């Protein structure tokens, strides 16, 4: 390739070996909810969307995908708990593999970030606690999301939820995915258990840091045993307080999880930068991910507000192995190429992030060739 030299001088565009997977570059497609899976079934247009963002040896993570019928909290997000879901994912995975991509499915349970309209038989959502969530303004800045007060899970119910994650991982492998990412971030069920401002349990799943991390680690253990630890990652956001899920000692929480994950030998740990305290906004912050980075023995992925410049710097200074890009990858299907040649980026269109149109704001962002 004629610009091979230029490529080598861009840290984000250097190859990386992630366990069994040989990555050609370090620009990862972050998991992005897009709400275009009608009736929770992945659609053919998703094959176009993901394959547009695939490069040979590129690593992609799906949008958050529900592990059960109680896992949903948003309109038209995909699932992976039925045979129909598995069959619908297969051509999407095939499209990514046809272009040489590595594709992980992010498995997810929203916990209390839901309302009875999304729940089977109109029941209350489940959580570690019965603490209700305040209404939130949606991303369009107008509509209000209302949450039904959750039902506290009985201790006898928790193994069933762990098993839902295990079965979802098995289904992901049946659909052809290369692995799964456990969604332990952003105020959803796993994060609710970890965070002391939400988890007020008095049994073995609440109280101490170790007890609050018991549920997440049981899921890691079950999923790793089901599909092999070398096909498992986890996403964490210890420093964030999305969906009123903050922690009073996030540094200790993050470090404990990073150290504990080593016992299971999983492939990677994907962490949202401390500067991303709330969704989409960068804040000045004294915390750093370096203690977690140093403690975790597998591949480390950082996400949260990265540009080309600070992504390159994070890799070159050894602060992370890979960098996950969300909004910029959404708007620039050929983001690795643009980073390689330092091309200008398409601006993202926030109003179409979560609309249901199968093309507009989804597969119609221009490529470099078509903008020349």
Swiss-Prot record:
One of its GO terms (molecular function) is 12-oxophytodienoate reductase activity. GO terms for cellular component: cytoplasm. It catalyses: (1S,2S)-OPC-8 + NADP(+) = (9S,13S,15Z)-12-oxophyto-10,15-dienoate + NADPH + H(+). Substrate binds at residues 183, 275. Induction: By wounding, locally and systemically, by cold and heat stresses, by jasmonate and by UV-C. Up-regulated during senescence. Seems to not be influenced by UV-A and UV-B. Induced by the explosive 2,4,6-trinitrotoluene (TNT). Specifically cleaves olefinic bonds in alpha,beta-unsaturated carbonyls and may be involved in detoxification or modification of these reactive compounds. May be involved in the biosynthesis or metabolism of oxylipin signaling molecules. In vitro, reduces 9R,13R-12-oxophytodienoic acid (9R,13R-OPDA) to 9R,13R-OPC-8:0, but only poorly 9S,13S-OPDA, the natural precursor of jasmonic acid. Can detoxify the explosive 2,4,6-trinitrotoluene (TNT) in vitro and in vivo by catalyzing its nitroreduction to form hydroxylamino-dinitrotoluene (HADNT). This is 12-oxophytodienoate reductase 1. The lineage of its organism: Eukaryota, Viridiplantae, Streptophyta, Embryophyta, Tracheophyta.
């Amino acid at each position: 390739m004629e610009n091979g030299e230029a490529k080598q001088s861009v840290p984000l565009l250097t190859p990386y070996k992630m366990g069994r997977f040989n990555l050609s570059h370090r620009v990862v497609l972050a998991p992005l909810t897009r709400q275009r899976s009608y009736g929770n079934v992945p659609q053919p247009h998703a094959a176009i969307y993901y394959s547009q963002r695939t490069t040979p040896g590129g690593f992609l993570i799906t949008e958050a995908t529900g592990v059960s019928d109680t896992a949903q909290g948003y309109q038209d997000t995909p699932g992976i708990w039925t045979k129909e879901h598995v069959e619908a994912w297969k051509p999407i995975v095939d499209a990514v593999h046809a272009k040489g991509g590595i594709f992980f499915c992010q498995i997810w349970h929203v916990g209390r970030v839901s309302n009875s309209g999304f729940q089977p038989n109109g029941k209350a959502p489940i959580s570690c606690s019965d603490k209700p969530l305040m209404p939130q303004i949606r991303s369009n800045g107008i509509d209000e999301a209302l949450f039904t007060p959750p039902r506290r899970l009985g201790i006898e119910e928790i193994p069933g939820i762990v098993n839902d994650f295990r079965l979802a991982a098995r289904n992901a492998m049946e659909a052809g995915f290369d692995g799964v990412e456990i969604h332990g971030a952003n105020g959803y069920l796993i994060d609710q258990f970890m965070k002391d401002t939400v988890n007020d349990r008095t049994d073995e799943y609440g109280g101490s840091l170790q007890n609050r991390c018991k549920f997440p680690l049981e899921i890691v253990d079950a999923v790793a045993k089901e599909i092999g630890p070398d096909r498992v990652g986890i996403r964490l956001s210890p420093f964030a307080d999305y969906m009123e899920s903050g922690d009073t000692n996030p540094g200790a929480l993050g470090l404990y999880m990073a150290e504990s994950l080593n016992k299971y030998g999983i492939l990677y740990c994907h962490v949202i930068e401390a500067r991303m305290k709330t969704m989409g906004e960068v804040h000045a912050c004294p915390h750093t991910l370096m203690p977690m980075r140093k403690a975790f023995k597998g591949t480390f992925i950082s996400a949260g507000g990265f540009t080309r410049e600070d992504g390159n710097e994070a890799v070159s200074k050894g602060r992370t192995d890979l960098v996950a890009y969300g909004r910029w990858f959404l708007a620039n299907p050929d983001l690795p190429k643009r980073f390689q040649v330092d091309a200008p980026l398409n601006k993202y269109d926030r109003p179409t992030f979560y609309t249901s149109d199968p093309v507009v704001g989804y597969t119609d962002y221009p490529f470099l060739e078509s903008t020349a």
